[in-house]
UniProtKB/Swiss-Prot annotation:
The RNA-binding motif binds to the RRE present in incompletely spliced viral pre-mRNAs. This region also contains the NLS which mediates nuclear localization. These overlapping functions prevent Rev bound to RRE from undesirable return to the nucleus. When Rev binds the RRE, the NLS becomes masked while the NES remains accessible. It is found in: Host nucleus, Host nucleolus; Host cytoplasm. This is Protein Rev. Residues 1-77 are annotated as: Disordered. A motif (Nuclear localization signal and RNA-binding (RRE)) lies at residues 75-92. GO terms for molecular function: RNA binding. One of its GO terms (cellular component) is host cell nucleolus. Homomultimer; when bound to the RRE. Multimeric assembly is essential for activity. The gene is rev. Disulfide bonds: none annotated. Residues 32-43 have a biased composition (Basic and acidic residues). It comes from Ovine maedi visna related virus (strain South Africa). Residues 1-15, 44-64 have a biased composition (Polar residues). A motif (Nuclear export signal) lies at residues 106-115.
Length: 144
């Protein structure tokens, strides 16, 4: 075994590192800067078209790997791939009426009505409206 005297010590001396207060100030500054930069980037995104910064379909400049644009592949990708890209791009722009949960009830949708006589049918009684005696926990446990 080689003696540890030959190896340089991997311990950081106390004098080498800055005082804690300074390092914390640096950390906080860095966090603030990063937050500001993120907010600026969010504002710069085109809100309607591009949902996230990670999704490059709608960015104006095209990268080297892209099929067209300034540094793209010389031969445009044709046929099915192009159709697929268009389709994926269109999925980002699905209007809100196809997501009824996200927005309020829109005029195009009618209220769902049960057939005649269904309202009186005890099967369709809401459980909240009935008296709570039949939903007793102890009875339920005994029944099980």
């Amino acid at each position: 075994m080689a003696s540890s005297k030959n190896m340089p010590s991997r311990i950081t001396q106390k004098s080498m590192e800055p005082p804690l207060r300074e390092t914390w100030q640096q950390v906080v500054q860095e966090m603030v800067m990063r937050k500001q930069r993120d907010e600026e980037e969010k504002q710069n995104l085109v809100t309607g078209l591009q949902a996230s910064s990670g999704d490059p379909i709608y960015t104006g400049n095209s990268s080297d790997r892209s099929t067209r644009g300034p540094g793209g592949k010389t031969k445009r990708r044709k046929g099915w791939f192009q159709w697929l890209r268009k389709l994926r791009a269109r999925e980002k722009n699905i209007p809100s009426q196809f997501y009824p949960d996200m927005e309020g009830n829109c005029a195009g949708l009618e209220n769902l009505t049960l057939g005649e006589g269904m309202e009186e049918n005890p099967i369709y009684d809401s459980t909240a409206a009935t008296n709570t005696a039949n939903m007793d926990g102890r009875n339920w446990m005994e029944w099980r």
